[in-house]
Amino acid sequence: MNNKYKDIFSTFLNLFWHLISGPIMLLLIPFYLTPEQQGYWYLFGSIAALSTFADLGFSNIVLQFSAHEYAFLEINNEGYLLGTESNLKKISSFFKFVIIWLRNICSVAFPVIVCVGVIFLARDKVLSIYLLPWLIYALGSLINFFNNTILSFLEGMNQISKIQKTKFIVAFFNTLIIAAGLLLQINIYSLSFGMLLSSSFMFFTIFKTYGKIVKQMWKESKTFSYPWKKEILPLFKKYILSFVSGYFLFQIYTPLMHLFHGAEYSGKVGITMSLVTAAFQLANIFIYTITPQINMLIEKKDWKMLDNLFRNRLLLSLCSYIFLWGCFAIFVYFFADFAFIPQILSRFLSYKGISILVFCYFIQLFVNSWAVYLRGHKQEPYWLTGIFAAVWVFLLTLLAGKMLSPDLFFIGLLSQYIWGLPVSYIIYRNDKKKWHK
C-alpha cells in the first residue's frame, strides 16, 4: 500500500475504534458499576484531563520542529537515522530538549493533579476507598502524557502510519482490559489498570520500535547544544493563547446550556457535539496525515509541491465531510420513524440546531487547514483573532442561552464563522505571500 494511503488508513482505523469503544463502555458501565463508582470513574478522567493544561500545545510544536529537522534525514533499514552530521546533531539536541522539558513539566504538573484528586476524595470522605485506584490511574496518566509528546516527535519524522497503528493496538488493548475488569467485577480498578497497563505497553513499544534512534539521538546530543528555548518560547507563548482561546471556543457549550436550560438540553448539546466533532475528525484525517510533510516541504522551500499537496488534501477533506453528512441526511430521511430510531434522534438537538453546528464545523475545516499550513512555518498567526473570537462567542452564547430558544444556541459560533472565515483567509493569503518570497 502507498505510504500516503497507509497514513490515512491507520489514522482512520484508530479513530474508528475510538468511535466504537466509547459506546461499548457506555453499555458496560451501568451494569457493572454503582452510581457512586460511575461518578468517580468519570471524575478520575476529568481530573487527569488537567494534563491538557500542562501541554498547552507544546506537543504540536514538537511535531512541527521535529518535521523541520527531519526534512533532510531518513531512517535506514537497520533503524538508524541517516543524514549530514549537522542535521543529525540538531534533531538530536531537539530530542534532548523535549525530554528535559517533559521532565520539568511532569515533576510539577502531576503532583498537583494527584493532590487535586486527593482533595476531592477527602472532601467526599471516600479517600480510603478510592485513593489506591486514583494513584494507579494518575501514574498511568503520567506515562501516557510522556508517551503522547514522544509520539508527536516521531510523527514529525513522518512515522504517522506506524504510530497510528500502534495507537490502535494500544486502544484495543485498553478496551479489552477495562471490559475484562468490569466483567470480573473489580469495578473502578478496571479503569485504573487499563490506563496503567496500556500506557506502559505503549511506552515499551515506542522504545522497542525506535530504541536505536533514541539511543543514537541521545548519544549525539551529548556533543552538541542548540538554543531551542530561545527559538521555541516566543512561539509557545502564542500557542498558549491560541489553546486557551480554542478551549473556550469549543468547550463552553454543555455547561452553559446546562445553566440556562437544564440537564436534558445539556445532554443534547453534548451528544450532538460528539457526533459533529466525530465527523470533523474523520474528514480532517486528510490534513492531519500530511502535517509532517507540510513542515518538511516548507523546510525544503518546495512551494509548488506543498501547495499541490495541500490543495488536494483540503478538497478531499471537504468532500468527505459533505459525503458523511449527506449519508446522515439520507438515513434520517428514510428511517426517522423506524423502530427505535425516533428515540435515539430525540436525544439530539433539533435539525435546525444540528444544521447550524454542522455548517460551523464545515467552515472550521478551512480555518483548521489554513492554520496547519501557516504553523508549518514555525509561526502562530491566528492567536490574536483566536482571542477575539473566544470573547465574541462566549458573550453571544451567554445572550443566546438567556434570550433565545435552544435551537439557536450556536448562533454566536455561527456569527463568528461568518466574519472569521474571510479574516482567516486574508491572514492565510497575506502570510503565505510574505513567507514564500
Residue ranges and their predicted role:
Residues 1-4, 188-195, 204-250, 301-304, ...:
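Interhelical loop/hinge segments that connect adjacent transmembrane helices in multipass membrane
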Residues 3-68, 72, 237-263, 274-277, ...:
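Signature of the first transmembrane helix
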Residues 5, 42, 78-104, 232-236, ...:
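Interfacial transmembrane-helix starts/ends
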Residues 7-15, 48-49, 102, 106, ...:
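Residue-level signature of transmembrane alpha-helical cores of multipass secondary-active transporters
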Residues 56-85, 280-301, 376:
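Helix-loop junctions and terminal segments of transmembrane helices
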Residues 108-128, 323-345:
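Short membrane-interface helical motifs at transmembrane helix boundaries
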Residues 135, 164-214, 388-389, 406-430:
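Hydrophobic alpha-helical transmembrane segments
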Residues 141-165, 359-386:
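Membrane-interface junctions at transmembrane-helix termini in multi-pass inner-membrane proteins
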